[in-house]
Every structure is written in C-alpha cells, then in structure tokens.
Amino acid sequence: MKALSPVRGCYEAVCCLSERSLAIARGRGKGPAAEEPLSLLDDMNHCYSRLRELVPGVPRGTQLSQVEILQRVIDYILDLQVVLAEPAPGPPDGPHLPIQTAELTPELVISNDKRSFCH
C-alpha cells in the first residue's frame, strides 16, 4: 500500500484552482457561468420591484433605493406583528351562540315543502 503525501495533494489542489482562476481571468471560462451574475442581478431587481408592489404605503412614481425598500418591508412586517399580537375584539353584544332550530319561532322555520327556490 502506497502512502500519499498530504503536502503533495494540497499542492496539486492549489495548482488546479490557480489554473482555473487564470483561465477565468483570461476569459476562457466564459459561457453560462459568465452570464450567471447578470441573471442573478435581474432576479434581484425583479424581487425588489415585486416587494415594492406588495408593500402598502410605497408611493408610486417615486424612486426608492433598495435599502429604502427593505426598510419599508421591515416596517410593514413589524406592523403586521403588532396587529397579530393584539387580542381579537369580541362582538359588542357578547359572544355568539349557535341557535338550534327548536329555539326558533314557528314562522322562522322553513318547512320542507317551502325549501324550493324555483317556481
């Protein structure tokens, strides 16, 4: 069984990485990988415009920076958390209880022959 030198293995890995770096720097690595940053930038711009549409209170027609858009999103999320943390208001007359058919007066109960809505 042969023993491998850990130093030599690291050296080969570094050489391989530096050769790839030089190839990319010289432009030999252009292709889908070179187009990736542009598509990512387009995706991020789309996300910022989508956030701008979704958050209420962002004035239309004014130019906001990405930081300002994010700050408005954060403020909106905090406002939603405050609203959700508040107890839900109860009905003003007290709690609603289900009404049984037997508790209704006879004129309010619809008989089976009157349930037809068509003439």
Curated annotation (Swiss-Prot):
GO CC aspect terms: cytoplasm; nucleoplasm; nucleus
Cell location: Nucleus
Induction / repression: By phorbol 12-myristate 13-acetate (PMA).
Gene Ontology molecular function: bHLH transcription factor binding; leptomycin B binding; protein dimerization activity; protein domain specific binding; transcription corepressor activity; transcription regulator inhibitor activity
Every bHLH domain range: 28-80
Domain of life per record: Eukaryota
Matches recorded under Gene3D superfamilies: Helix-loop-helix DNA-binding domain (4.10.280.10)
Alphabetized SUPFAM superfamilies for the sequence: HLH, helix-loop-helix DNA-binding domain
UniProt keywords, alphabetically: Biological rhythms, Myogenesis, Nucleus, Repressor, Transcription, Transcription regulation
Matches recorded under InterPro entries: bHLH_dom (IPR011598), DNA-bd_prot-inh (IPR026052), HLH_DNA-bd_sf (IPR036638)
Covalent S-S links between cysteines: none
SMART domains on file: HLH
Tissues expressed in: Expressed abundantly in lung, kidney and adrenal gland, but not in adult brain.
Pfam families recorded: HLH
GO biological process: cellular response to leptomycin B; central nervous system development; circadian rhythm; epithelial cell differentiation; heart development; metanephros development; muscle organ development; negative regulation of DNA-binding transcription factor activity
Primary site of residence: nucleus
Xref: PROSITE patterns: BHLH
PANTHER family the record matches: DNA-BINDING PROTEIN INHIBITOR (PTHR11723), DNA-BINDING PROTEIN INHIBITOR ID-3 (PTHR11723:SF16)
Role description: Transcriptional regulator (lacking a basic DNA binding domain) which negatively regulates the basic helix-loop-helix (bHLH) transcription factors by forming heterodimers and inhibiting their DNA binding and transcriptional activity. Implicated in regulating a variety of cellular processes, including cellular growth, senescence, differentiation, apoptosis, angiogenesis, and neoplastic transformation. Involved in myogenesis by inhibiting skeletal muscle and cardiac myocyte differentiation and promoting muscle precursor cells proliferation.
Assembly and interaction partners: Homodimer, and heterodimer with other HLH proteins. Interacts with COPS5 and COPS7A. Interacts with IFI204. Interacts with GATA4 and NKX2-5. Interacts with ANKRD2; both proteins cooperate in myoblast differentiation. Interacts with CLOCK and BMAL1.
Official protein name in the record: DNA-binding protein inhibitor ID-3
Gene coding for it: ID3
